């Protein structure tokens, strides 16, 4: 009985061992099939390694050369620029300079009180104005001046109209005008009379006397030795001189106007 049991046990153990071996073989066979599906890596030779190194060097070479060229270009002096580029840069610098000078002149013509009032205590009151703020304040300042001119013109026109209405109502301007005419006529009449009297005295005959003798010794004796009255003909004198005629003609023409 014991021999039979031992033989059965050995037989079962043998079967288990064979099955395990079969499974291990099957797994090994399956793994080898999977490895065969993947392409095996070809070992690299010396020629392939050299080709790879050359390709890497060729890729790195242009990068280094471009960096070197860029570095050298930055260090190039300005004299090596193209003439067209140099002229363009000079024109641009001149334009920027003119614009800056124009804004400086504009800031100088803006009163500081106007800048402080229009900037509302902002940047313009203490610091340098920007170009945008300068233009904005200049526009507001010009508008304010234009409004002042318009208001002044309108007020002066109203004042003229009001004064004309008042003078037409009270008649004072008319009286002043009459007074001025009367004074001018009186002046012209006096001038005419003086001119006529001057011409009459110039035409009248004038007597001539001889000189007197003065004797010494404390006694003064005047003797009229000769008294020759020389009369020129009245016809030889004209009533009016040429200058008087011109003056009278001018006065008469002025009165007729």
Swiss-Prot record:
MF terms in GO: DNA-binding transcription factor activity, RNA polymerase II-specific; protein heterodimerization activity; sequence-specific DNA binding
Domain (bHLH): residue spans on this chain: 83-145
Assembly behavior: Efficient DNA binding requires dimerization with another bHLH protein.
UniProt xrefs under Gene3D superfamilies: Helix-loop-helix DNA-binding domain (4.10.280.10)
A GO CC term attached to the entry: RNA polymerase II transcription regulator complex
Tissues and organs where the protein is expressed, per its UniProt entry: L(1)SC, SC and AC strongly label the presumptive stomatogastric nervous system, while ASE is more prominent in the presumptive procephalic lobe.
Matching InterPro entries: bHLH_dom, E-box_TF_Regulators, HLH_DNA-bd_sf
Biased composition (Low complexity): 165-184, 193-213
Additional note from the record: AS-C proteins are expressed first earlier in ectoderm and then in the internalized neuroblasts, while T8 is expressed in presumptive neural precursors, once they have segregated from the ectoderm.
Region (Disordered): 161-221
Top-level taxon of the source organism: Eukaryota
Official protein name in the record: Achaete-scute complex protein T3
CDD domains recorded: bHLH_TS_dAS-C_like
Any one biological process term the GO annotation gives: Malpighian tubule tip cell differentiation
Function: AS-C proteins are involved in the determination of the neuronal precursors in the peripheral nervous system and the central nervous system.
Keywords: Developmental protein, Differentiation, DNA-binding, Neurogenesis
Pfam families: HLH (PF00010)
């Amino acid at each position: 009985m014991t021999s039979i049991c031992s033989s059965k046990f050995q037989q079962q153990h043998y079967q288990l061992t064979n099955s395990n071996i079969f499974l291990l073989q099957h797994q090994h066979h399956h793994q080898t099939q999977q490895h065969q599906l993947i392409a095996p890596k070809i070992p690299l030779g010396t020629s392939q390694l050299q080709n790879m190194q050359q390709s890497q060097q060729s890729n790195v070479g242009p990068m280094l050369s471009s960096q070197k060229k860029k570095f050298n270009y930055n260090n190039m002096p300005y004299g090596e620029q193209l003439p067209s580029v140099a002229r363009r840069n000079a024109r641009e610098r001149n334009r920027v300079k003119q614009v800056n000078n124009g804004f400086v002149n504009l800031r100088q013509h803006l009163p500081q009180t106007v800048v402080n009032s229009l900037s509302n205590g902002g940047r313009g009151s203490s610091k340098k104005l920007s170009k945008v703020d300068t233009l904005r304040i200049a526009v507001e300042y010009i508008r304010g001046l234009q409004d002042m001119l318009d208001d002044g013109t309108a007020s002066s026109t109203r004042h003229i109209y009001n004064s004309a209405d008042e003078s037409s109502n009270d008649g004072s301007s008319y009286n002043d005008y009459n007074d001025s005419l009367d004074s001018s006529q009186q002046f012209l009449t006096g001038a005419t009379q003086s001119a006529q009297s001057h011409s009459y005295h110039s035409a009248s005959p004038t007597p001539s006397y001889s000189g007197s003798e003065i004797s010494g010794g404390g006694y003064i004796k005047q003797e009229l030795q000769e008294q020759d009255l020389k009369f020129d003909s009245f016809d030889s004198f004209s009533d009016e001189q040429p200058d008087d005629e011109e003056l009278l003609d001018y006065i008469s023409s002025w009165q007729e106007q």
